[in-house]
Amino acid sequence: MAITYQIDLHAGMLFVVADGETTQSERLEAMRTWLTDPMFRPGLHTLCDLTAAVTVPTLPELEEIAGVIRRHAAVIGRKKLAIVTSRPVTFGVARQFGALAPGALLTVQVFKDRHAARAWLTEPSA
């Protein structure tokens, strides 16, 4: 249905929300949109809220997303990515993505609670 985002430069974060059914082309278009947003900068920690998402990416789609991240490494920079889910299947797919994501760029954690995810994002990196 919709993927929306907001960039909070004061907090140094990108907030992404997926709501309802989303397709791979919608996911990729959303990524292209925030990567070219004038407010986007490398290293923005990201909170991706999938609690209202109905569909999940397939393994090939996750691999495609990881490839986009690798190709845009200079624009994305090193960052933390917190993924918030409410359904077990979404939690599992998010963990799969964490294993596929380029570790040199992303530190990925999956949460069931938005507040815990935000707290992790604001902790100093080791």
Model feature map: region roles:
Residues M1-A126:
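Amphipathic, Lys/Arg-enriched alpha-helical "gate/interface" segment within cytosolic domains
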